[in-house]
């Protein structure tokens, strides 16, 4: 430990991102990236911005991107906040809205950045257990709190909370902010964005990383009542005035303008998810219902960590979590049909081989 570290840094437990291996010939199914390329219109927009304009700072407010997002979701531009990926947007939301006198609430099995933000910003929190079937039970959140935050679909389980349940939570929990983290909503769920004009304490956060194939561009955004958005803007203005570069802004605008490519990509992933889920079930895996671009699975007779290691030996990377309740599960990104077939073939050999042993 370095003697120059502050007490805050000494006590931090940073988020550990999914591995980005520097190897060739990998079937990479560990970080929920889209297996298909971005829209050609996005690539054309980025190429068009490559030139002398890069000597200039980008628009600090990214107004063109805010307007594109507002048009898509049917809200005002003053109801949109943009940031350098949804993680940055979440970080600003924790600072701006969730540092209250009462603890905030989030699921015990959820996106592991939430407790990291709480540690970094000294935010009191309590975790709420998921049910035995890994579902969020709304009534467990109907108690005094400093805010509620959860992903929908949940990560890493992929389970979807119906929009009607979110509406119930918002109706009965009006004294604190509710943040719905919708990184995966485009793969089968109904967005809570439809509720932002009815509930002034709702903030919806989304990303272009997953359904729009732009994880490398880093664009996230929030939708909410203008007062909530202003709070995020105040934090942003105290941290980084230019979170989005010129390429991210024009690429993001083009992504929202090309609805045909977006629809094709997400439909392909949803079809492959169903096909992959059936194949895994035929191999004896328990497959949780998923509305995301990944599946969460375990095998009743085979250890999760051992399966992940054996797949890695075959140059197939999936995500394994050494956490209570889910240490036997694998989170598997939905890749192309070809990638998923390679995975199924490898698992078939492993399951059969271990059963014979």
UniProtKB/Swiss-Prot annotation:
Signal peptide segment: none
Record SUPFAM superfamilies: PLP-dependent transferases
InterPro entries, alphabetized: Aminotrans_II_pyridoxalP_BS, Aminotransferase_I/II_large, HisP_aminotrans, HistidinolP_aminotransfase, PyrdxlP-dep_Trfase, PyrdxlP-dep_Trfase_major, PyrdxlP-dep_Trfase_small
PTM annotation (N6-(pyridoxal phosphate)lysine): residues: 210
Pathway: Amino-acid biosynthesis; L-histidine biosynthesis; L-histidine from 5-phospho-alpha-D-ribose 1-diphosphate: step 7/9
Protein keywords: Amino-acid biosynthesis, Aminotransferase, Histidine biosynthesis, Pyridoxal phosphate, Transferase
Cofactor dependency: pyridoxal 5'-phosphate
Catalytic activity: L-histidinol phosphate + 2-oxoglutarate = 3-(imidazol-4-yl)-2-oxopropyl phosphate + L-glutamate
Enzyme class at the top of the EC tree: transferase
Pfam (any one): Aminotran_1_2
Protein family membership: Belongs to the class-II pyridoxal-phosphate-dependent aminotransferase family. Histidinol-phosphate aminotransferase subfamily.
Quaternary assembly: Homodimer.
Protein name per its UniProtKB record: Histidinol-phosphate aminotransferase 1
Organism of derivation: Methylococcus capsulatus (strain ATCC 33009 / NCIMB 11132 / Bath)
Name of the coding gene: hisC1
